[in-house]
């Protein structure tokens, strides 16, 4: 079977296991009496999961000993979770007669047990032990990134032991299906993919870390838009073939009756909520017909009604954002109550009783939650997007309640006020509609107040008043100043209101992303699993390398050989008397970055490869390395090449005795690796034996048979017990065989001397 076919089969099995896990999670929340007829099928599925684990478990474990893949890892976790939780449901069903429905829910959902998402992680480094607690998804990702940064001061056994604890956490989370519990995810914590995306997008002069503060992560978990409609029950009811057709018909009839009552009540309420001023104006206009003369007053009322109607039903322009949102939280609460009424009605029609599901049995506890917790828990009747839109609607409503903003956002306000004043002038009471409409129609607008009569001028002599006005135009200065001030006040209010609305809209757009990520249904992404697999494969490759080189045909172990001291002294004296070629510093620096970088960020091995400094940049930035350490790391090789770069004593290369603390141990490991790189560079230029290849043990890979492929070169294993291994005369594809020569050493100079001896003419080594 080819690799593609094997992958297809694993994907098919993984999909079926995921479907089974989803069904188990649904059954945990259903009335246990509904599970009793399904016990046979549940047991058959549980036995199938056991059979799959027995049949695939051995092969999956054997593969994990050499190299893990995300698919195989996810399948292993899903099978383990499915077996444990499926049998938990079966045990709870067997005990339901004694424990009752509440005991069933407490057993299946582990309500009386401590939180299952708290996992302690212990890591032994060369600089001392590290203890951490993983309780969120971003905690697991942060620990994996920290372990990736500290890989060169961590042995493979300690690294794999720590990853085993992380795997337990991932089994309870990533292995539990596709839906993420809301208490596990905090989208305000950016992941490594968020950082990489911000590094390749336009920053507009803003620092990456400042942009990360405004980042909402959608990689560790991915949000899904879920829509819930009122007709979902009616839509799926005809497909419930397990009940009699008569009961289905009765349930459909009951749903139609409920919907008719709801629509009738909604229409009656809508008809009774019309503004009283508009009602009076409508009755006033309805009492007129074409055989009656239309006064200017009646025409003004009709004109105001026209403008009010045109702004309400007009199709000019796009609707405002405030008008596009759904009803407020009270409306959503009514929608949820109607959904539960529908569900209870259908259950009574189909089964003759209502079922004790989890949300009904624990309704009192759920009602005790506050608004925020209630929205996080969610509802089967209201989608998260409806909650989000209701929140934004409430935000807009509160902001728009200011009179200043109401005048700007609601242009009909002035029209309604004018209509109300007009009806009041003609003697119509807008509160109860009393008054004689016929007499009111004869009122002329010219006599409704405003300008005084022509003959009632206060000035006795018209000519004198006119002369004074013409000679002294400044007498209206106060009036003009008042009008100008009013106009400026109006313009300032409009500008201030528009700016306020723009700021509110910008705030809503920014916060909406976080609201959607928090309240929507989230599913597990692939970032966390890929990060775990990459870190696991790095430590696993180191273990496989150490096991592979131990099977070589010729093994020379100089780690505890006292006879190698003369070789150490000779090679050290020969290399230290020669200066380092400064033209080699760029390549030497890149080799340093390549050897200290962790296994997670392997950008140099991508199809579109990036230099080693890019991968190291992602590694140190994702762990929040302090700026002074980043500066020291960037200039490390340049500084080391200018001084005495030989720091290790005889057979004490990669020795950390007496050093405590992660930072101090890490800095010493950098010095050891820098010494190895500089010694190899000078060795190649002095003895003219070609380039000495410095390789990493965690960049070796197994073949299809599981054998580790190790090409010829000097390997750094990052193991304090055996830090340096030289592999000579390996097969063309890196296979370790009888002709392969392997040299173990814990001293750089004695190892180079041994390599020089093996490369001498007539030795047969290469």
UniProtKB/Swiss-Prot annotation:
Keywords linked to the UniProt accession: ATP-binding, Host nucleus, Late protein, Metal-binding, Nucleotide-binding, Viral genome packaging, Viral release from host cell, Zinc, Zinc-finger
Major location category of this protein: host cell
Positions with a binding annotation for ATP: 683-690
MF terms (GO), sorted A to Z: ATP binding; zinc ion binding
Zinc fingers typed C3H1-type, residue spans: 191-219
A biological process from GO: viral DNA genome packaging
Record-linked InterPro entries: UL28/UL56
Pfam families, A to Z: PRTP
GO (cellular component) term, any one: host cell nucleus
Subcellular localization, as worded in the UniProt entry: Host nucleus
SUBUNIT field: Associates with TRM2 and TRM3 to form the tripartite terminase complex. Interacts with portal protein.
Function according to Swiss-Prot or TrEMBL: Component of the molecular motor that translocates viral genomic DNA in empty capsid during DNA packaging. Forms a tripartite terminase complex together with TRM2 and TRM3 in the host cytoplasm. Once the complex reaches the host nucleus, it interacts with the capsid portal vertex. This portal forms a ring in which genomic DNA is translocated into the capsid. TRM1 carries an endonuclease activity that plays an important role for the cleavage of concatemeric viral DNA into unit length genomes.
Family: Belongs to the herpesviridae TRM1 protein family.
Name of the protein: Tripartite terminase subunit 1
Organism field: Equine herpesvirus 1 (strain Ab4p) (EHV-1)
Phylogenetic placement of the source organism: Viruses, Duplodnaviria, Heunggongvirae, Peploviricota, Herviviricetes
